[in-house]
């Protein structure tokens, strides 16, 4: 099944917030944060449409800029996002990892061939290269993101994973020192909420 169309890419929209700390290092963390809750009950999904999903993949070096993404495959990317979020949430909350999320991430890691095979041609001679036909662009992207999530969740940075401490934000980040906000905006909102609670006597801390 082809995931790519021949349609031209649409205009890239700017995200509502800068990447959370750690998201530039771990694309899987940025994927987990690609759907976010905004003040006033609003939400933003950076993978809402096939064009949005294609732009996100292109921006992370996981798809060519001149390829479009079909909805069925954009849905697969959104599904992997939810499974990675479930694993991050279980890690942050200290709960057992959901079996369905483990299975989905493991399947994504093994769906595309990861080995760089040997090839020979007159120009380059003997060399290694990974198969990456157009029909497998999404599979390779999902495999890369799943492997990145596994590294994040089991590596040295796993202890620094935390949820943004400024409701209604639902993003995750890698904690630096005592900071537990994903952005300056969330930090300002949390400080303003604490100041308001102190003024009105509603501080439960």
Model-predicted regions and their roles:
Residues 177-188:
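Cysteine-rich micro-motifs
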Residues 191-202:
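Short metal-binding segments enriched for Cys and/or His
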Residues 1-163, 167, 172, 202-205:
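Short helix-coil boundary/hinge micro-motifs
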Residues 78, 82, 186-191:
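Short alpha-helical segments used as structural interaction elements across diverse proteins
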């Amino acid at each position: 099944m082809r995931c790519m169309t021949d349609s031209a890419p649409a205009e890239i929209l700017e995200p509502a917030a800068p990447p959370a700390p750690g998201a530039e290092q771990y694309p899987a963390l940025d994927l987990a944060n690609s759907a976010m809750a905004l003040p006033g009950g609003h939400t933003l999904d950076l993978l809402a449409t096939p064009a949005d999903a294609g732009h996100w993949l292109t921006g992370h070096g996981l798809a060519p800029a001149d390829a479009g993404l079909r909805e069925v495959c954009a849905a697969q990317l959104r599904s992997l996002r939810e499974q990675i979020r479930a694993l991050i949430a279980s890690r942050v909350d200290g709960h057992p990892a959901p079996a369905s999320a483990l299975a989905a991430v493991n399947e994504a890691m093994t769906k595309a061939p990861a080995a760089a095979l040997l090839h020979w041609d007159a120009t380059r001679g003997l060399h290694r290269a990974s198969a990456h036909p157009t029909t497998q662009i999404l599979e390779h992207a999902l495999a890369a993101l799943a492997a990145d999530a596994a590294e994040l969740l089991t590596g040295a940075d796993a202890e620094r994973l935390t949820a943004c401490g400024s409701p209604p934000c639902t993003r995750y980040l890698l904690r630096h020192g005592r900071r537990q906000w994903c952005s300056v905006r969330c930090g300002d909102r949390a400080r303003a909420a604490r100041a308001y609670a102190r003024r009105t006597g509603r501080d439960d801390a």
